[in-house]
């Protein structure tokens, strides 16, 4: 346990340039507190102490602003940077060395039971405000841009941006032009469809 705590603090110190010492990280970083509480809650959850697990989880949520369901499976060295508003669902699975920024949601697909939440591979980065919704895999070393809405699988070492998210880069190879002008806008597409329908009715 102490070994894992030590490597967690080291991961924070490595990834957060504002972190000046492990002592500061341990006492003052809500992301660390949320992860420690989740380890306890998850241990209780796996042993079918569901009420106690949810109680620990909710106490952590109120203190840190980070909502991690006790059923979620989280790997080693998870770094939560500016964690306010993060939500991690019950059947979510996170690999090792994942980095999450504020406002991230790892949400469900709407199924009543079973695997409903995403699986993130090792070394995945999810930008601020991004939503990853559904039961699919985000591959190792993938990057999700800020405010993206990911609704399907992301390959390893790929970058996903936009609403809904699309793959713009795999490794060093650019898949599509990365610009904000041409990111699909479903609301605008629907308005255009309605306008076309109105024109058709007017002409008829």
Describe each model-derived feature in a short phrase.
Residues 61-168:
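Structural signal for interior beta-strand "rungs" in well-ordered beta-sheet cores
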Residues 170-173:
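A structural signal for small-residue-enriched, beta-sheet-centric alpha/beta enzyme cores
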Residues 1-61, 175-204:
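Terminal amphipathic alpha-helical/low-complexity segments used for targeting or macromolecular assembly
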């Amino acid at each position: 346990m102490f070994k894992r705590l030590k490597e967690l603090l080291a991961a924070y110190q490595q990834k957060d340039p504002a972190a000046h010492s492990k002592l500061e990280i341990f006492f003052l970083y809500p992301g660390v507190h949320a992860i420690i509480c989740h380890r306890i809650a998850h241990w209780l959850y796996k042993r079918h102490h569901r009420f106690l697990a949810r109680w620990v989880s909710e106490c952590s949520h109120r203190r840190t602003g980070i909502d991690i369901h006790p059923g979620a499976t989280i790997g080693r060295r998870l770094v939560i940077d500016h964690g306010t508003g993060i939500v991690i669902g019950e059947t979510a699975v996170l690999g090792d060395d994942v980095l999450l920024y504020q406002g991230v949601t790892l949400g469900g697909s709407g199924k009543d039971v079973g695997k409903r939440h995403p699986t993130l591979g090792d070394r995945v980065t999810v930008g601020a405000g991004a939503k990853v919704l559904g039961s699919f895999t985000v591959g190792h070393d993938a990057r999700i841009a800020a405010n993206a809405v990911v609704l399907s699988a992301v390959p390893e070492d790929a970058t996903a941006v936009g609403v809904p998210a699309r793959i713009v880069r795999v490794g060093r190879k650019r898949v599509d032009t990365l610009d904000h002008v041409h990111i699909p806008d479903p609301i605008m597409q629907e308005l255009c469809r309605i306008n076309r329908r109105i024109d058709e009715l007017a002409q008829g």
